[in-house]
Amino acid sequence: MKMNERFWDNLEIILAEKDLTWAELARKVFNGQYVYPSEFNRLYQKLRHYKSNRLMPQTRWVERIVLVLDIDYEDLFKR
């Protein structure tokens, strides 16, 4: 399994364990980066694009995900 696929599979499991939706994750990750709903929607759609195409997100997104979910970086790539 490729690292990017493992990342998305593990993130999906972690979100389920924390009872969070993808939209809630996006709100936490992009907090402070948008004012209007259209700006949030653009960021959320970008996250969905990465997820649906199983692309590895930008390093700063990964770091932010680790921070807002209060998890270890390794949790996203092992399991």
Locate the predicted segments by residue:
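A short, Lys/Arg-rich alpha-helix, primarily the initiator
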Residues: 1-29
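Pre-recognition alpha-helix immediately N-terminal to the DNA-recognition helix
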Residues: 9-10, 46, 64
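Residue-level signal for the short linker/turn that defines the boundary of a DNA-recognition helix
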Residues: 9, 20, 42, 57-60
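DNA major-groove recognition helix of helix-turn-helix/homeodomain DNA-binding modules
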Residues: 58-75
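Residues in the recognition helix of alpha-helical DNA-binding motifs
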Residues: 28, 46, 50, 79
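Recognition helix of helix-turn-helix/homeodomain-like DNA-binding domains
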Residues: 34-57
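Alpha-helical residues within the helix-turn-helix
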Residues: 27, 38, 67
